[in-house]
Amino acid sequence: MKTNSSSNNLPLLDDFLLNLKANHYSPETVYNYERDLAIFENFFAEMKIDFSQLNKKVIEEYKAYLSSSDRKTPKKNEKGIDLASSSINRTLSSLRSYFHYLSEMEYDLPIPWDAVKLVRTEKNHSRVAEFKELVKLVESPSYLENEPKTAARNRAILETLFATGMRISEVLSLNSDDLDETGRIFIRGKGKKERFVYLTERARKFL
């Protein structure tokens, strides 16, 4: 079993980075891995522990460390900024990849490589547009476009999208024979699926 270490606190770190290069990772990606692992090395230095003392509790403390602006940045040794959950998870993913490499190299890891769990992320809930805002958007070509034909075309497209929920690619590919006199539109969707949608009276006025 391999137990030799690099000159720094992280064993086989240089070998790991070299392996990334050998597998055609971009220089930017390799740099990001190196930077993320330098943060982990800083954490070890501040906690005054070494790799052999690694355990699940240390990993949880590292997550708290990443969440704190009191941590030191690599090289400059300055206070860091608050990291978003997505940035913390990217840093933890780098650590998981490094641990996985050590496992593949049969290095005696103090903990399983997959013991590093990602943190929960906050879901960004997109604001639903107000009805008045949607109507204003649909009507905008009528007073923003100088060319009458362009205004009429764009208004018809937006009215159709608003009334039917069709994809824009579906609207742009419509032919006149796809619409019947009742306002029903025949759609050939993805995977050759076929369906019908119906225009509102309002939308039909602009076609």
Give the role of each language-model region.
Residues 1-207:
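Conserved catalytic core of the tyrosine transesterase superfamily
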